[in-house]
Amino acid sequence: MRSIVILILLMLQLCAVMATAETSGVPEKDTKNDLAIIAPNDFNATLNYSYEEIDRHALNAPASAESSVDSLAAYLIEPAGNDREKARAIFRWITENIDYNVEVFFKGGTGPTNSEDVLKSRKSVCYGYSDIFLSLAREAGLETIRISGYGKGYGYAPGKNFSGLPNHAWNAVKINGSWYLMDSTWGAGYVSVDKKYVRKFDDHFFMTPPSQFIYDHFPEDAQWQFLDEPVSKQEFENLVYLEPDFFNLGLKLGQRNGTISADKQINISIYAPEDVLMMAGLEYVDGGAAAGDGYTFCQRDEERYDIYAQFPAAGSYILKAYAKQKDEPGEYNSVLEYRINAASGDKESPGFPMIYGKLSEAGGYIFSPLEGKLKAGSSYLFRIRVPGAGNVSVVCGEEWTDLASRGVDLFEGNATAGKGDVGVYAKFHGAGWDGLVRYNEE
C-alpha cells in the first residue's frame, strides 16, 4: 500500500520547487551589521504612496495632448497636487509610450535622441528616454538633470569592468529640497535574450533609493550618487548584481562582493522575510549553460537562506538566486548573481539532494545527509527539521523508516539506503504524506 502512496506522491511532486546543494561550504560573515553597502543620504521615497489616479491620467493622454512636448507636459500635470505627482505622471507616460530601439542599439548607434524626435517616433535608446524626461520635467517646472554613467544593463555579467564612454543615461529630480533618482528606460521594459524589446513596467526605477540605485548605476560625477560615502568605480564593478525583485521582496545581503574566489565549494547567506521562498542555480560564465543538476542547494535557516554550491571543475561560474512570494503562483524570478572563480572542482562529487517545494513552504531544514547520492547498503543519519509535521519517514523502495521526534519540529534516526532513490516524507496534521527530499543512488 505504501508503495502506491509513494508513486502518487512522486507524481504530485512534479510541480515542486527544485534546488541543488552541498555540505562543508565556506561560510560568509554572518552578521547583519555588514549588510549595508554604505550609509545612504536617503529620503522618504519608500513610504507608501498611491499613484493610482495620476497613473490613470497619464496612461489616458489623448493624441491632441501628445502633439508637442509643451502640450504633453501641460496635460500630464493637470491633476498633480505636488511635484512628486508631476514627476510620476511624466515617468509613467514615458514608460508606457516609448519603445526601446533595439535595432539601433545592436548596431552600436543611438539614433535620434532629441525629445521632439522621440515624441514623434515613439522609440529611442536611453539617451532619448532621459532627454524627453528632462524636457517634460523642465516644462512642468521641475528642477531636473540628466546623468550619464555606466549601467549594468543588457549583456552585463558579474565581474565585468567598465571602460570608455558611458553606456547609459538617467535622470534626477529635485522635490521638496531632495534629489530623487529615476530611470525611465529600465522602468519601461527590457531587452530579452533573443534581442527583442519587452515592455514591462518596473516601479523600482521611480524614485529609487540611492543605496539601491548604486548597485547598477554609476554616474560619471560622484556627487550624483547621493551617498554619504560615494563608492569608487572599482567598488561599483565589484558589487554583486542585484535585480529589482531583490529589493521588492525585502531581501538583504550577507556578501556584497560580486566576485568570489572559492575552492571546490562555497556557502553564501541571503536574509529573507518569512513569506519569501528561494532557490538557486549554477551556470558556466562562458556560454551561460547550466552546470547540471545537484551542484546547488538552498534552504532556509530561520531568518536567512543558506545557498551552497559545488563545482564540477576549476573555472568561472555564475551563481544565481531566485525568489518569489510564498503565497503567489507562478515562477521564481531572478534576484541576484555572483561570479564564482573556482580554483578546483570535482566532477565525481555526490552533489546535493533535491528539495521539494513542501519542505521550503514548511520552513524545513536538512542537517544530514547533505550529499545527493547515497551508497546502497550504507547507513546514514537523517536529521531534519520540519515545522508542523506529525511524522517524518525515510522511504527506500517499499521500506519505511520512521524518524524519532527530538523536540520541537526536529526528527532524526538512522536508515540504510537501498537500491534506487531514497525519499524523505512528512505527514502533516490533518493531511496525507508529502515528499520533502529525494536522494539518488550512488
Regions flagged by a language model, labelled:
Residues 192-442:
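Alpha-helical and coiled-coil interaction segments, frequently adjacent to or embedded
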Residues 130-212:
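Hydrophobic/aromatic-rich core segments of domains that either
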Residues 1-25:
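Bacterial Sec-dependent N-terminal signal peptides
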Residues 4, 185-186, 282-283:
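Composition- and surface-driven signal marking solvent-exposed, interaction-prone regions
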Residues 25-125, 131-140:
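Secondary-structure boundary elements
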